[in-house]
């Protein structure tokens, strides 16, 4: 348990993780954990497979992390939303990524509702950063902007608001 706990502490000290993400990483076999690059000894030429991690021990480590407030899905969701929105992603993509990371749907919805991000303004900034201050007006170029913003995870209404505000 001590090895698993120290692994969890190391992972959580680097960044926040969701419970499902931490559980998956703890259950995974460490890839050549003791090996160093360039130091090949005769005994390390054929690494021995390690025994699978006991799920009960993982549960104990997860409970210990919750007990010490090291693991918190709500905090993870808030920080993840802030991080991804600063990188220019929209709410739809962030929601999808959080679901893939194992964050509960209701928790994701609540975190997105609590964040104070103006997604229309965010979409406008992303479009201007990619296509310049003068957004295209012809249909073909507008479609290119729209596809790009949809890929980045913005909703259709947010994209249309850019052109409504741009026209005024």
Swiss-Prot record:
It is found in: Cytoplasm. The keyword Lipoprotein does not apply. Transmembrane segments: none annotated. Pfam families: RecX_HTH1 (PF21982), RecX_HTH2 (PF02631), RecX_HTH3 (PF21981). Keywords: Cytoplasm. It comes from the Bacteria. Its main location: cytoplasm. GO terms for biological process: regulation of DNA repair. The keyword Ribosomal protein does not apply. Gene3D superfamilies: Winged helix-like DNA-binding domain superfamily/Winged helix DNA-binding domain. GO terms for cellular component: cytoplasm. Modulates RecA activity. NCBIfam families: PRK00117.1-3 (NF001053). Belongs to the RecX family. This is Regulatory protein RecX.
């Amino acid at each position: 348990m001590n090895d698993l706990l120290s692994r969890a502490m190391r992972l959580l000290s680097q960044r926040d993780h969701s419970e499902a993400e931490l559980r998956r990483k703890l259950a995974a076999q460490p890839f050549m954990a003791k090996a160093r690059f360039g130091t090949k000894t005769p005994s390390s030429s054929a690494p021995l497979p390690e025994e699978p991690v006991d799920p009960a021990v993982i549960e104990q480590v997860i409970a210990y992390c919750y007990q010490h407030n090291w693991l918190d899905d709500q905090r993870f969701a808030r920080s993840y939303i802030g991080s991804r929105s600063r990188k220019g992603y929209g709410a739809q993509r962030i929601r999808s990524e959080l679901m893939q990371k194992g964050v509960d749907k209701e928790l994701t919805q609540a975190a997105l509702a609590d964040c104070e991000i103006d997604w229309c303004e965010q979409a406008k900034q992303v479009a201007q950063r990619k296509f310049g201050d003068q957004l295209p007006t012809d249909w073909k170029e507008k479609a290119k902007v729209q596809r790009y913003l949809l890929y980045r995870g913005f909703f259709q209404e947010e994209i249309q608001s850019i052109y409504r505000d741009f026209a005024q």
